UniProtKB/Swiss-Prot annotation:
Stated name of the protein: Aspartate 1-decarboxylase
Organism of origin: Helicobacter pylori (strain P12)
Upper lineage: Bacteria, Pseudomonadati, Campylobacterota, Epsilonproteobacteria, Campylobacterales
Gene3D superfamilies: 2.40.40.20
Record note on quaternary structure: Heterooctamer of four alpha and four beta subunits.
CDD domains named in the record: Asp_decarbox
């Protein structure tokens, strides 16, 4: 049996852009994404602290420092400056659960790393 468990999280990131006319996804500063163990194309859940919206999308690695940009139709669910939590989950069996520690990255309002 497997369980969906928290794999990693970027906590309280700030939306820097929302691009309605892009195909879809969330663009995340590559360094920040790698620290959170997020891979390009990985499914993530976005929770907007300001308005309560929750939605799923996939990761695109961005080149700009501190970039967190929601793309496509989901851009209507956020506003620039909103605070979000970016969550990734993984299916794990009992042994994997016991050995796993989620990667949690805390950032400030400029999406600079506070703590890992």
């Amino acid at each position: 049996m497997t369980f969906e468990m928290l794999y990693s999280k970027i906590h309280r990131a700030t939306i820097t852009d929302a691009n309605l006319n892009y195909v879809g996804s969330i663009t995340i500063d590559e360094d920040l994404a790698k620290l959170a163990k997020l891979r390009e194309g990985m499914k993530v859940e976005i929770v907007d602290v300001n308005n309560g919206e929750r939605f799923s999308t996939y990761v695109i690695l961005g080149k700009k420092k501190g970039e967190i940009c929601v793309n496509g139709a989901a851009a209507r669910k956020v506003a620039i400056g909103d605070v979000v939590i970016i969550l990734a989950y993984a299916s794990m069996n009992e042994d994997e659960i016991n050995a796993h520690k989620p990667s949690i990255v805390l950032v400030d309002e400029k999406n600079e790393i506070l703590e890992k």
